């Protein structure tokens, strides 16, 4: 995983954007997930807690108005592009990017051809916000993975830890249009 870094002290990241100097006051170690834009310039960082910190993720933008899409600098837009929520999940799929959250609008506004995009949201059928975003994404006629009922794990990372063949599950459960709507109705729990 050559896309990840480690820092001993979270307060070191303030040098990337002085706006955060008053909000980051702790000194704990963090896993650093860097975000680069399409021009391969650093656009932000997500720092993940390693010891069960109350604030699990701290995201820092270099420029306030720049979108953070992990992996956008490495993706081949002429092939299927898998769009997941978290940077760590994206490391388990070839040609994937991460939204740094659940908003799909970032990717909808990107330069990736619509037919090449496959949204792979977390498996949280009881999360109303997520369910609404999955519904909106289906209504916008994108390819969406609808997890089968047999999958109980929340995200790709958990599935990999459970020895689930994630690529096979995604391949067999990617839907669009009316079929996606039908599978979505079966999947959601709110």
Can you name each region flagged by the protein language model?
Residues 2-116, 130:
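Phosphate-handling DNA/RNA-contact segment within nucleic-acid enzymes
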Residues 43, 55, 78-81, 87-190:
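TOPRIM fold recognition
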């Amino acid at each position: 995983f050559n896309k990840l870094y480690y820092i001993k002290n979270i307060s070191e990241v303030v040098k990337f954007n002085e706006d955060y100097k008053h909000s980051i006051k702790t000194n704990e170690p963090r896993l650093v997930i860097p975000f680069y834009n399409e021009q391969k310039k650093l656009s932000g960082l997500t720092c993940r807690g390693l010891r069960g910190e109350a604030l699990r993720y701290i995201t820092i933008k270099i420029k306030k108005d720049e979108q953070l899409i992990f992996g956008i600098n490495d993706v081949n837009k002429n092939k299927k592009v898998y769009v997941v929520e978290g940077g760590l999940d994206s490391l388990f799929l070839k040609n994937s990017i991460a939204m740094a959250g659940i908003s799909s609008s970032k990717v909808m506004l990107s330069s990736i051809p619509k037919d090449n995009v496959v949204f792979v949201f977390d498996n949280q059928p009881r999360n109303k916000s997520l369910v609404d975003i999955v519904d909106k994404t289906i209504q916008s006629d994108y390819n969406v993975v609808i997890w089968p009922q047999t999958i109980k794990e929340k995200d790709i990372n958990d599935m990999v830890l459970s020895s689930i063949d994630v690529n096979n599950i995604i391949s067999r459960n990617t839907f669009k249009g009316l079929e996606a709507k039908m599978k979505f109705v079966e999947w959601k729990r709110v």
